[in-house]
Each structure stands twice: as structure tokens, then as C-alpha cells.
């Protein structure tokens, strides 16, 4: 019985395919040939009827307000983070304030060293290592002050 069903399906499929091919062969395609080809060199550009913008905000302003752009002076490039960080860490008041904030927040020296050791940049690693060593010295100094009191 299964073989009979399979053969009937094959015959029906062939009959449908043959009927569609013969129907397509009888159609008149001369109208498609009679149309003239479009010459793209002679097309006229039309203006847009509306001035819809793709963005909701002005390009000159960002999400939080106006965006300022200060171009670098000739021959002068913006310093990388390493240079900025070393400059900021050369100020002892800022470094001590940073150590004080870490100390008040309860960060251990091991945690600070671990968090600062995640950079793959060689210059930053050296700077962060120096910073971690400085924090360790700061914590030891604080602990010795507390023991004296």
C-alpha cells in the first residue's frame, strides 16, 4: 500500500509541474521586450518632500548637552593615559587623598594590589605597582600611628 501512495504522489507532482510549464510557455512576453531601457545618465534628481532626519537630536549636541571639541595644537598630540596618570600621581596631595579614601573604604593592601594588577600595558603596570607599594606603606604608617596612640 505504501508503494502505491508514493507512486501516486510522484505522478501528481509531475502532472502539476508539466501543467505549469505549458501554461508559462503560452504567455506573451512581447510587452516586456517593447519597453525602453532606463538610461541612468539622463535621470533628474528630485528633492525630498520632507526633511526627515534619522536622529532625534542635533549632531552638534550630545545626549547630555553641547559637545565641545578642542583640536590639538600643531605638532602636539593628546597625551596617553600613562602620561596623565603619572602627572596626576606626581602630586603627593592627590595621592595621599586617594590612599586616605581607600583606607576609609576598608580596602586591604592585597585587594588594591590585585585590582591594580589587571592591566596588560607595561607602563601602567609599573605605575600601578608603584601605587600599590605606596598604599602598603601608607597602611603600615596608619597602623603604626594607631598602635602608638
Curated annotation (Swiss-Prot):
Residues spanning the signal sequence: 1-23
GO cellular component annotations of the record: extracellular region; host cell cytoplasm; host cell nucleolus
Subcellular location field: Secreted; Host nucleus, Host nucleolus; Host nucleus; Host cytoplasm
Span of the annotated motif RxLR-dEER: 52-77
Induction: Expression is induced during host plant infection.
Family label: Belongs to the RxLR effector family.
Domain text: The RxLR-dEER motif acts to carry the protein into the host cell cytoplasm through binding to cell surface phosphatidylinositol-3-phosphate.
Role noted for this protein: Effector that enhances P.infestans colonization of Nicotiana benthamiana leaves.
UniProt name for this protein: RxLR effector protein PITG_18609
Native source species: Phytophthora infestans (strain T30-4) (Potato late blight agent)
High-level lineage: Eukaryota, Sar, Stramenopiles, Oomycota, Peronosporales
Amino acid at each position: 500500500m505504501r508503494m502505491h501512495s508514493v507512486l501516486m504522489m510522484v505522478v501528481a507532482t509531475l502532472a502539476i509541474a508539466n501543467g505549469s510549464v505549458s501554461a508559462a510557455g503560452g504567455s506573451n512576453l512581447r510587452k516586456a521586450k517593447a519597453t525602453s531601457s532606463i538610461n541612468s545618465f539622463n535621470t533628474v534628481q528630485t528633492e525630498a518632500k520632507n526633511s526627515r532626519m534619522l536622529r532625534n537630536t542635533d549632531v552638534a549636541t550630545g545626549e547630555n548637552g553641547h559637545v565641545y571639541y578642542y583640536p590639538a595644537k600643531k605638532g602636539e598630540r593628546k597625551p596617553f593615559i600613562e602620561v596623565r596618570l603619572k602627572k596626576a600621581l606626581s602630586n603627593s596631595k592627590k595621592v595621599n587623598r586617594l590612599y586616605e579614601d581607600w583606607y576609609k573604604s576598608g580596602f586591604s593592601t592585597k585587594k588594591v594590589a590585585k585590582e591594580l594588577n589587571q592591566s596588560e600595558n607595561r607602563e601602567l603596570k609599573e605605575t600601578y605597582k608603584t601605587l600599590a607599594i605606596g598604599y602598603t606603606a601608607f597602611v603600615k604608617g596608619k597602623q603604626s600611628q594607631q598602635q602608638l596612640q
